[in-house]
């Protein structure tokens, strides 16, 4: 249930909605926490196993194509809203919460998440790809609305970037370093 080498499961996680030929990874794993992603990446780093993160698979650019010598980490079980501060227009979600799921959650508080790339993408993938959409002129892009991330680095280290404050001049803006990094610097597991 949390680890699969079956061909049918691997085929389901071999590509997104792009036109690239699917590539089956050796296995698909389904972590539920940052710590589980960390353990997986530590092992993969130690044994030099390539990793492909997989959210909802809505990518049109080949981000979700598997690696025949590696594993796919499906974030589908990391789909919870962790906190909401409606008065501050701020929430923290796990990476596989979709924009529609988040907006359903936010509706009763009279707020909404404005980034709409067209597909019902996961917020972790939207951050990794620096998504925008039809309302970007008014509300900005992912780079504008995301104030912090939790990222698991290739060596398994878990880092938190940013803060709940809207303005800060303390230190490097690591949040914007990871937004748009396409998963090359680490796996985004939480978005704030």
Which residues are covered by each model-predicted region?
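Residue-level detector of anion-binding/catalytic polar loops
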Residues: 49-50, 112
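FAD-binding subdomain of flavoenzyme oxidoreductases
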Residues: 80-84, 91-192
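Feature of Fe-S/electron-transfer and energy-metabolism proteins
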Residues: 9-12, 30-36, 43-46, 60, ...
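N-terminal flexible segment immediately upstream of the FAD-binding catalytic core
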Residues: 1-42, 58-89
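Generic beta-strand/beta-sheet core signal
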Residues: 6, 54, 74-76, 116, ...
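Short, basic and Ser/Thr-rich N-terminal targeting/leader segments
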Residues: 45-47, 54-56, 121, 145
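Glycine-rich, histidine-containing beta strand-loop boundary motifs that form or position
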Residues: 53-57, 64, 95, 115-117
């Amino acid at each position: 249930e949390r680890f699969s080498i079956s061909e049918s499961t691997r085929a389901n996680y071999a590509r997104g909605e792009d036109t690239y030929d699917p590539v089956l990874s050796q296995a698909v794993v389904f972590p539920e926490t940052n710590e589980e992603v960390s353990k997986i990446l530590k092992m993969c780093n130690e044994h030099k196993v390539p990793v492909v993160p997989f959210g909802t698979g809505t990518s049109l650019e080949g981000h979700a194509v598997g690696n025949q010598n590696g594993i796919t980490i499906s974030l589908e079980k990391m789909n919870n809203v962790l906190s909401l501060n409606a008065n501050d227009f701020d929430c923290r979600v796990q990476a596989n919460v979709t924009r529609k799921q988040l907006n359903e959650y936010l509706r009763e508080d009279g707020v909404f998440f404005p980034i709409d790339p067209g597909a019902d993408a996961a917020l972790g993938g939207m951050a990794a790809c620096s998504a925008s959409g039809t309302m970007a002129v008014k509300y900005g892009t992912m780079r504008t609305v995301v104030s912090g991330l939790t990222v698991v680095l290739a060596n398994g280290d878990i880092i938190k970037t940013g803060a709940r404050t809207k303005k800060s001049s303390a230190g490097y803006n690591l949040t914007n370093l990871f937004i748009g990094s396409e998963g090359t610097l680490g796996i985004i597991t939480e978005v704030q």
